[in-house]
Amino acid sequence: MTYLPVALTIAGTDPSGGAGIMADLKSFQARDVYGMAVVTSLVAQNTRGVQLIEHVSTQMLEAQLESVFSDIKPQAVKTGMLATTEIMEIIQPYLKKMDCPYVLDPVMVATSGDTLIDTSARSYLKTNLLPLATIITPNLPEAEEIVGFSIHDPEVLRSEERRVGKECRSRWSPYH
């Protein structure tokens, strides 16, 4: 019997299906990967913007993580919208003890421009989750938030990419 590789997404929802766990699960399926999901936040949004965000309770978040990690061990984990420090503090121990690739998508702002993460969580992400990541997938505004300044020059972008890459736990990088 052949089993599919297993990946876990830990993120918020997007009822339009264009982002969040819905998009992650579609991507997993398109690549013949068995996808699992832990929901961090329920987001009411569409192409015009974010209407409402409600974070799951800490008890529910912990129960979802424990359910997944105590049974079907993921072979890769991707995080998306982790909107608060409290959410990140619950997730971090699971990320620290796993031995598989970790993709960090530092979701900070919706495509519509709406803020999706609070200020203290931005700092926590950079200090505590970034070093655990195998790879990070920021867009330009998120990359600028991570490095702390605007990036207008492609050479500066490559230089910062190298520097940040060295801070991650990546086993392979073109810059190592």
Task: State the predicted function of each range.
Residues 12, 105, 139:
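Active-site glycine-centered loops adjacent to acidic/histidine catalytic or metal-binding residues
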Residues 118-169:
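Conserved phosphate/ATP/ADP-binding segment of small-molecule kinases
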